[in-house]
């Protein structure tokens, strides 16, 4: 996630939110730490309102996106710990008339196939699942053979698969707030 924060920063984003999975999972803890490390490295202020934990489904991703966009200074970019949660942002953007990759940038993690078919295609990080499977199989074989097996704590760097869901912001947080206010008035 540190690399994702750096990417968004290089595109011009300064208000970057993070939608995390259940913090009890090791991967979620590591992704949160990466997000926070990225903010710190770039001198961006950490805002607790810009971090939501416990988001596991597309519907929860949708709700989290709505909550973040209702902040007085909404994020121009949102990182998601999982692609499944990120896909919920697409419905919200459509409902509010926002163009993903322009008024709202999204980067997530997992590389699920559905992300490639989203409109625009999701920008995502993923790991080499073949290598991860080989590591797990080697551990299982050791275990079956009665060898002592340490817990697998090895992590490999994720690879960015650029889609079109992230781009330079076309509006500031303040301008985005005004757009969202207008969208709310039109909907009622």
Label every model-predicted segment.
Residues 64-187:
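Flexible loop/turn connectors
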